[in-house]
């Protein structure tokens, strides 16, 4: 069953976390870069990257870090995109979600939103990748693809990459159209900006990513990482932690792209300490056998002058 919740509901559920950030004090503001940061022009599944260069797809406020790269901005950007898609909540088992019979019912293809997904690709991906010109319903040549084949244009990793890019991660995130690229980069230590943790031994924080294998790769566990191959996966951005509410009691909230063809919020069960798996790594979530928590290394918890 799908639910729609109000913005105020999410606000109150995240207020306690925001207050903790305020009590912890504010990080000093980084100096604004005089020029945009250089990032790899391409990043590959084996961990190698292309040459560094300026990416003119990325706004100056992000590439020059008008604010330090921080957790608050990542969660806020993810929640902004969620509201744009109508604030859907996807708490049912993905195996029980039938595909819409009418392509017009797919949020990713409706006016205003298919273009937004194009922005996720354009900004989030490295500039020389073919995918930068994709949208929610067209390929790089502008040809509308059949809705039945939209799995070939899956945009959930593009959404994650977009949020990190716009928040000012610059060269500290392995942007990719595939979640496995940054899961493996974090697990292998090839990315200095992201570390991978066993879900049974690390408590997710706001702005971290929690990840799971999909389909034939649902059996991937933390002990198998990094893999020597790419694999289908999904990651969501932790938008709220330490929640005690329906439907699970102890829970956290994640925001992910391409969930039911939209940006959706999902509640994830935790234990009383906020972890998503027990000490052996067994997920508390019967829907998702989480394989990793990706800790993103931010400059700050929040904007120095955010007012919170």
Where are these regions (language model features)?
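Bacterial N-terminal signal peptides that target proteins for export
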Residues: 2-15
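C-terminal motif of bacterial Sec signal peptides marking the signal peptidase cleavage site
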Residues: 22-25
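Bacterial signal peptide processing site
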Residues: 27-29
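N-terminal capping segments
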Residues: 36-167, 305-308
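Secretory-pathway/luminal and periplasmic proteins that interact with or process carbohydrate-rich
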Residues: 84-90, 168-172, 217-219, 262
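Short, solvent-exposed loop/turn and secondary-structure capping segments
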Residues: 90-93, 174-176, 222-223, 265-267
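...with weaker cross-activation on analogous glycine-rich loops/strands in unrelated enzymes
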Residues: 172-260
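Low-complexity, Gly/Ser/Thr/Pro-rich intrinsically disordered linker/tail segments
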Residues: 253, 258-308
């Amino acid at each position: 069953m799908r639910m729609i919740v109000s913005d105020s509901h999410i606000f109150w559920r995240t207020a306690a976390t925001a207050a903790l950030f305020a009590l912890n004090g504010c990080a000093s503001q980084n100096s604004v870069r005089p020029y945009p940061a250089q990032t790899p022009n391409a990043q590959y599944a084996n961990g190698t990257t292309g040459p560094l260069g300026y990416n003119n797809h990325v706004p100056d406020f992000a590439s020059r870090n008008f604010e330090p790269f921080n957790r608050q901005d990542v969660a806020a950007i993810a929640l902004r995109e969620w509201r744009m898609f109508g604030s859907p909540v996807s708490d049912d088992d993905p195996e029980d979600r039938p595909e819409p019979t009418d392509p017009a019912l797919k949020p990713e293809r409706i006016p205003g939103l298919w273009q937004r997904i194009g922005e996720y690709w354009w900004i989030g991906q490295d500039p020389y990748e073919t995918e930068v010109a994709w949208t929610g319903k067209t390929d790089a040549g502008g040809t509308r693809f059949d809705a039945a084949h939209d799995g070939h244009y899956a945009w959930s990793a593009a959404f994650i990459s977009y949020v990190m890019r716009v928040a000012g991660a610059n060269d500290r995130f392995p942007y990719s159209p595939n979640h496995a690229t940054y899961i493996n980069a974090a697990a292998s230590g090839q990315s200095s900006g992201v570390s991978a943790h066993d879900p049974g031994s690390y408590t997710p924080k706001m702005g971290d990513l929690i990840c799971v294998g999909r389909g034939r790769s649902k059996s991937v566990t933390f002990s198998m990482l990094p893999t020597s191959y790419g694999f289908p996966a999904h990651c969501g951005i932790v938008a709220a932690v330490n929640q005690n509410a329906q439907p699970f009691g102890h829970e956290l909230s994640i925001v992910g792209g391409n969930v039911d063809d939209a940006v959706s919020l999902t509640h994830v069960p935790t234990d009383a300490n906020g972890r998503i798996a027990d000490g052996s790594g067994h997920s508390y979530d019967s829907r998702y056998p989480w394989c990793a928590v990706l800790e993103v290394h931010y400059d700050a918890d929040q904007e120095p002058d955010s007012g919170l």
